Amino acid sequence: MALNEAFLPSSTVRDNVVNLAKLLNYVPRSIQAAKACLKLELQTNQVNGAYPSNITLKKGPVATGGNFVWNVLADTTVEVNTSTGIATFDKVSIKEGSIVNFQYIVNTFAKQIYKIPSEDADISTLAVRVKANESATASDLYNQVDTVTNLTATTRVYFLAEGEDMRYEIRFGDDSVGRAVKDGEVVDLEYLVTSGPDGNQVGTFSFIGKIEDSTGKVYPTASVNIVTKQKSQQGDKAESVESIKYNAPRYYSAQYRAVTAQDYAIITKNIYDNADSVVAYGGDALNLSLIHISEPTRQAEISY
């Protein structure tokens, strides 16, 4: 390896930059799926003279638009108007892509790294579950953490890092800091594979999802009225090499606390990944406790 690749400021190869950023506990942002907001409405049918009490929009593909497939990532249930029988899903957030499930069977006798095999995985949609064996139906949800503070031997967490070729890797605890997975357990990874920014600015959608009421009746797609409340936006490419080199040392220097104006800016950008840039300033005379944050997003500017 060339000497310049051993240092973050001068490194140019992404895998080398990512490995150096790991030393600063920095996880580069993955590709991000475009998202839109829909309103869905349909007329339910009476059963024995009464309308169903509620209706559920099932997780999975719900719409097509702009040559893409759009999904909801969890079941959504709303109540049915008992007088009219109309059910309304007022703010349905949909994301572009395909939902993928990938499983590993735990083998502690070999060094096992749990890789997400898809390069275009939106890591913000990642759900990690562990079940006792292949035939088990119940599973435990594990949460991502980036610090060992307050973790016990039984805390169900995982640690995330970008690996080679922009494919992310998951590691579990060691029964000291976080629970370790056991032989024969099954690790289930669910995430969205997306086209990123290509899915932006789509405003016309056709419903393809599944809606089921409390009596078990499934409604045809043609019976659903669909209205676009917000066209698709916020799809983005994975974080660039230059962005990683800039953000990693600043994220590390903040150390999860906001003291300086730069700390506020870095932490805010980490939380609000739709921000193009963040500027924080404050410390004005007689108002030392006030920090102003100006955040131009990809669609508008937010100040608070």
Locations of regions flagged by a protein language model:
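Hydrophobic alpha-helical segments, chiefly the membrane-spanning helices
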Residues: 302-304
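Signature of Asx- and small-polar-rich beta-strand/turn repeats characteristic
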Residues: 1-290, 294, 298
